[in-house]
Amino acid sequence: MAFVTVSHWTSTEISEEMISTANEKFIPLIMGVGASGVQMVRTGELSLCVVTQYPDAAAAQTAQAKIAEIREQVAQDFPMTMVSAHGGEVTGSSELHQIKN
């Protein structure tokens, strides 16, 4: 069963440069430790969350030591603080796939 983690972050600033760096540097690092998907979601002017999908709980557990290192690096590189992190097995989901003309 798929597993998802969500980490909540606050910052003193969120610039386009920070977002670009996160997309180019940190998302590939997260994907490289076994994630099957990751999204950064801006939840406020100075807050965001990172939603990471894994194929299963075992993959998520295996990745956690490296994820902790990545989170530490984010906090060093940016004026950001992780407020909380949660995770659990996916109990239901749906996706809408749009057909491009």
Where do the protein language model's features map onto the residues?
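Short S/T/G/P-rich N-terminal loop/turn motif that feeds into the first structured element of a domain
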Residues: M1-E72, Q76-N101
